[in-house]
Amino acid sequence: MFTFIKKVIKTGTATSSYPLEPIAVDKNFRGKPEQNPQQCIGCAACVNACPSNALTVETDLATGELAWEFNLGHCIFCGRCEEVCPTAAIKLSQEYELAVWKKEDFLQQSRFALCNCRVCNRPFAVQKEIDYAIALLKHNGDSRAENHRESFETCPECKRQKCLVPSDRIELTRHMKEAI
C-alpha cells in the first residue's frame, strides 16, 4: 500500500485542470477554420475542395454579390480549404472548444461584389478576383496588365462572340477540290 502511495506522489498529477486552464495542443492540430474576408478573393477554390460541403457559394443577381457561407457543423477539419486557398485567407486555428447554443452560430458568411461584363453588363466574376489577377501579373513584371483590364472585365461569352468570324466571310469552296 505504501509503495502505491509513494508511486502516486512520485508521478504527480495525472490529469489537467482543463476548464480552469487551456489544454496545450500540438502545432499541427487542425482546429476551427477561420476565414479572413479582407484577404479572400471569392474564387471558390475552397468550395470545390471541401469534401463535406461545409462551404457553399451562391450568386445573388439582385444585389450583384457572391454569398460565401461556411457551416462549421458540417466541417470535418480535413484542411483541404486551407491547402487550396491562393491567398491564404483560410487558416485552421488551434481552437477546439466549438460548442454553441444556437445552430446559427455555426455559420460564417461573407459577401463579395461581382464584376459586370463591360459588353453585356451581366455579372460573371468577383471583382476582387479580377483585381487580384491584375495585381499578380504586375507583381510578376507584366507592365501592361492594367492596360488589359477591359479584357479581364469582359465575360467569356462576349470574348467568344468577339473572336468569331461572321459566317458570310467564310469561303467554304476554297477547301474543296474542283469537280471534274
UniProtKB/Swiss-Prot annotation:
[4Fe-4S] cluster 2 binds at residues 75, 78, 81, 85. GO terms for molecular function: 4 iron, 4 sulfur cluster binding; metal ion binding; oxidoreductase activity, acting on NAD(P)H. It comes from the Bacteria. Residues 31-60, 66-95 form the 4Fe-4S ferredoxin-type domain. The keyword Methyltransferase does not apply. InterPro entries: 4Fe4S_Fe-S-bd (IPR017896), 4Fe4S_Fe_S_CS (IPR017900), NADH_quinone_OxRdtase_chainI (IPR010226). One of its GO terms (cellular component) is membrane. Gene3D superfamilies: 3.30.70.3270. Transmembrane segments: none annotated. CDD domains: MtMvhB_like. Keywords: 4Fe-4S, Electron transport, Iron, Iron-sulfur, Metal-binding, Repeat, Transport. One of its GO terms (biological process) is anaerobic respiration. [4Fe-4S] cluster 1 binds at residues 40, 43, 46, 50. PANTHER family: FORMATE HYDROGENLYASE SUBUNIT 6-RELATED, NADH DEHYDROGENASE UBIQUINONE IRON-SULFUR PROTEIN 8, MITOCHONDRIAL. Probable electron transfer protein for hydrogenase 3. FHL comprises of a formate dehydrogenase, unidentified electron carriers and a hydrogenase (isoenzyme 3). In this non-energy conserving pathway, molecular hydrogen and carbodioxide are released from formate. This is Formate hydrogenlyase subunit 6. It comes from Escherichia coli (strain K12). The lineage of its organism: Bacteria, Pseudomonadati, Pseudomonadota, Gammaproteobacteria, Enterobacterales. The gene is hycF.
